[in-house]
Amino acid sequence: MIQSIAFFFDAGIILYLFGLKEKKKMRATLFVVLLYKCLMMTTGARQEKVAYLIVLLYLYFFVCNTVTVGKIAMVVAGCVAGFIFISAIGTVRTGSSSGIKDVLELMQSGQMSNIFGSALGEFGSAFDTLEVAVKYTPAYITYGYGTSYLAGLISIIPLVVKQIPFLDKATIFVHQLPGGVYFALGGSYLGELYYNFSWLGLIGSAIIGKFMGKLNLGIVLSKQHNALYGAWCAIISTAMIMFVRGYFTDMMQKLVWTYFIISLIYAYLKRRST
């Protein structure tokens, strides 16, 4: 539930960005959030911050502003700097030190090599969980038959899933395996689909891809039609990007509660204006 409450901040920034008309305020908001997220990344977890910044930068450069060659060049330069920064954080985390000072010192030292290779290597690790799912299901653990997604829906109510053993073990299915197998494994929506539906999970992948396309369309058309709907599509997109390396239960609670709060505020403001 704490993660759900923290997600309200991220959702609020996206809503605020969509509501801004002044370019200076947009730039100031982007700078402050970018600085804050980068500082938070140096303390450890990077995935959620990176996923959020991807959506936020996309909104700022390609939705809220007119696309120009200069802005594209700026995005490319920012991506290169981001690769270096994230790789430096990963290198620092493997040692005994941590923090923004150590990360900046490493970046300035010139000791980092094969930065892009290391960054691309992170994508390969996403298949580890899928490989484990294919290898051990159903040989070691039985198919979930959709229990992971049922658990995700029920997880909207805090602490309930923990009281139902067969749902609890399905939330992170790899925890049913010996510790030596799942140690340091991240999540994977592909692995979760296979665990639940075997190769029929391919159909689920197509559905998720179609859904992501709908979200992007909602964001792109939001400025001409419905800014609130576009903001909500962007909020869901941050969770969906994390879903690639996560589990269904990771996003359901925070998305539903965020939608509930936004709906309450919207209803209150609408009633107040009439």
Regions found by a protein language model. Name each.
Residues 7-17, 33-39, 163-169, 188-194, ...:
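Short juxtamembrane and helix-loop transition motifs at transmembrane-helix boundaries
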Residues 40-46, 157-163, 244-245:
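Membrane-interface helix-loop junctions at the exits of transmembrane helices
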Residues 87-208:
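Small-residue-enriched transmembrane helix-hairpin modules in multi-pass membrane proteins
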